From Swiss-Prot:
Binding site for NADP(+): 11-14, 34-35, 56, 83-85, 147, 151, 180-182
Cellular compartment(s): Mitochondrion matrix
Keywords, comma-separated and alphabetical: Acetylation, Fatty acid biosynthesis, Fatty acid metabolism, Lipid biosynthesis, Lipid metabolism, Mitochondrion, NAD, NADP, Oxidoreductase
Superkingdom to which the source organism belongs: Eukaryota
Subunit structure: Homotetramer (in vitro). Heterotetramer with HSD17B8; contains two molecules each of HSD17B8 and CBR4. Does not form homotetramers when HSD17B8 is coexpressed, only heterotetramers (in vitro).
Protein family (similarity comment): Belongs to the short-chain dehydrogenases/reductases (SDR) family.
Official protein name in the record: 3-oxoacyl-[acyl-carrier-protein] reductase
Gene3D superfamilies linked: NAD(P)-binding Rossmann-like Domain
Active-site residues (renumbered): Y147
Catalytic activity, reaction form: a (3R)-hydroxyacyl-[ACP] + NADP(+) = a 3-oxoacyl-[ACP] + NADPH + H(+); a quinone + NADPH + H(+) = a quinol + NADP(+)
Length: 236
């Protein structure tokens, strides 16, 4: 199988787990991260002909150059996963403007830029995109107003794009995780939060990755938001 999957934010967390599953299925991976050395380690661990690329998704020129390099060395991108994201928890009245902007640029603008760049080849051949959102973007949370805005915006963007490009055989979906064991949740006390999760625990990155891969490969699903949260949305 020579289809190419680009995973932005693929060097760690959910993105890394997605890359592992897609590699096992025989796809060629482009592991994209702001830290090239970490991306190279991840690509090397996958084995085979997988490559690492450096990109700051908030910078349009970076994104465009990265897609050019991926196409040059791997071929046209068939699957795109946007898993790069940051969070700066704070009550709105205490949130620095620069923290709002950085979250908007990485979590929302970054995915918009990568999707736009992917369209250049996907319009000709079709493709599948999964943007990693968050249950916070659907339900909101105290101290995460800016983060919630970026992830909620990602849902609106993804659904609109799905309508725009469906006739070109391009599918766009969102996976919205709840509390998942990643670097972003490392500081949280699981014992405190899991009592509100019907399944009684935080999720694993691989569990979210299975949902991402399902949407990537499902030929008749587009514009969908798949919640992977252990039932958390039932209680909030």
């Amino acid at each position: 199988m020579d289809k190419v999957c680009a995973v932005f934010g693929g060097s760690r967390g959910i993105g890394r787990a997605v890359a592992q599953l897609m590699a096992q299925k025989g796809y060629r991976l482009a592991i994209v991260s702001r830290n090239l050395e970490v991306a190279k380690v991840t690509a090397g661990e996958l084995g085979g002909n997988h490559l690492a690329f450096r990109c700051d998704v908030a910078k349009e020129q970076d994104v465009q150059s990265t897609f050019q390099e991926m196409e040059k060395h791997l071929g046209p991108v068939n699957f795109l996963v946007n898993a790069a994201g940051i969070n700066r928890d704070s009550l709105l009245v205490r949130t620095k403007t620069e923290d709002m902007i950085s979250q908007l640029h990485t979590n929302l603008l970054g995915s918009m830029l990568t999707c736009k760049a992917a369209m250049k080849t996907m319009i000709q051949q079709g493709g599948s995109i999964v943007n990693v959102g968050s249950i916070i973007g659907l339900k909101g949370n105290v101290g995460q107003s800016a983060y919630s805005a970026t992830k909620g915006g990602l849902v609106g963007f993804s659904r609109s794009l799905a309508k725009e490009v469906a006739r070109k055989k391009i599918r766009v979906n969102v996976v919205a995780p709840g509390f998942i064991r990643t670097d972003m949740t490392r500081h949280l006390k699981e014992e405190h939060f899991k009592k509100n999760i019907p399944l009684g625990r935080f999720g694993e990155t691989l569990e979210v990755a299975h949902a991402v891969v399902f949407l990537l490969e499902s030929p008749y699903i587009t514009g969908h938001v798949l919640i992977v949260d252990g039932g958390l949305q039932l209680t909030v």
